[in-house]
């Protein structure tokens, strides 16, 4: 494993990653989307792996760019739109009208 990636294993907060790479970030975006940002960063790392033999300067620059991209995804969009986690991927096309919900609740109330 690349030494830069090894150092990341000790981090637990999104802010630690962002500070380590010197990525400027919006605290309000990170507060709401921290897990989404880290998951997206991991997805980007999987698509553009950092080889074990990549020099530290290049590895740092690569990771910084990928983390900045992950953060910026959630500046411009929402977690539901980005669909990083499965719970958001399963929501497409599933909506329930308010009238349908009211009718369902009324039917349940009659059975009780």
From Swiss-Prot:
Highest taxon listed in the record's lineage: Bacteria
Keyword Kinase (UniProt): no
InterPro entries in UniProt: NifW
One GO process term, biological-process aspect: nitrogen fixation
Name of a matching Pfam family: NifW
Key words of the record: Nitrogen fixation
Subunit structure of this chain's protein: Homotrimer; associates with NifD.
Membership in a protein family: Belongs to the NifW family.
Role noted for this protein: May protect the nitrogenase Fe-Mo protein from oxidative damage.
Protein name as it appears in the record: Nitrogenase-stabilizing/protective protein NifW
């Amino acid at each position: 494993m690349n030494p830069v990636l090894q150092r990341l294993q000790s981090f637990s907060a999104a802010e630690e990653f962002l500070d380590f790479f010197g990525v400027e970030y919006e605290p309000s975006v990170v507060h709401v989307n921290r897990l989404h940002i880290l998951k997206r960063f991991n997805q980007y790392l999987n698509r553009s792996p950092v080889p074990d033999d990549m020099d530290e300067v290049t590895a740092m620059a690569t990771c910084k760019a990928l983390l900045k991209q992950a953060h910026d995804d959630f500046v411009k969009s929402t977690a539901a739109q980005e669909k990083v986690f499965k719970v958001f991927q399963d929501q497409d096309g599933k909506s329930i009208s308010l009238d349908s919900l009211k009718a369902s609740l009324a039917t349940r109330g009659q059975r009780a």
